[in-house]
Regions:
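CN hydrolase (nitrilase-like) catalytic-core segments centered on the catalytic cysteine
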Residues: 1-87
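Cysteine/selenocysteine-centered motifs that mediate thiol-based redox chemistry or coordinate metal-sulfur cofactors
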Residues: 8-12, 96-122
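Residue-identity detector for threonine
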Residues: 27-28, 58, 94-96, 111
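Residue-level signal for alpha-helical context at structural boundaries
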Residues: 36, 91, 114-117
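A short, polar/charged loop-to-alpha-helix boundary motif
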Residues: 84-101
Length: 122
């Protein structure tokens, strides 16, 4: 979540849904988990699903939990609690095209001023 460029690359490659397995801890989770998922969804105008383990206070690493799904507008569509939960959320992938047409952030990038370079495996 902290590496915005990765999500931009995926969006430029046509991603409409990005599934992110992650486990923020109890320090960063409350402050950053939802904020970063909403920002990455909004920045790249795609759905993001953050899949986190449920919280286990007896574990060596205590996960913040709170799996969630954000839409291309950066709105939270579904969010789990800290306890084990099956999170189900209906999404319409055509919504990414509609949002990208309404606010063409990806097309408005100034690639004449900066480049995002990455190497693709062939």
């Amino acid at each position: 979540m902290r590496f915005a460029e990765l999500f931009r690359i995926l969006a430029l490659e046509g991603a409409q849904l990005i599934v992110v397995p992650a486990a923020f801890n109890m320090t960063t989770g409350p402050a950053h988990w939802e904020l970063l998922f909403r920002a990455r969804a909004l920045d790249n105008q795609c759905f993001l699903a953050g899949c986190a383990p449920a919280r286990d206070e007896t574990a060596g690493y205590v996960s913040y939990a709170h799996s969630l799904v954000c839409d291309p507008w950066g709105r939270v569509q579904a969010q789990a609690e800290a306890a084990p939960q099956l999170l189900i959320c209906d999404i319409d992938l055509t919504e990414t095209d509609a949002v990208r047409a309404q606010i063409p952030v990806l097309r408005a990038r100034r690639t004449d001023l900066y480049q995002l370079k990455y190497e693709k495996d062939s």
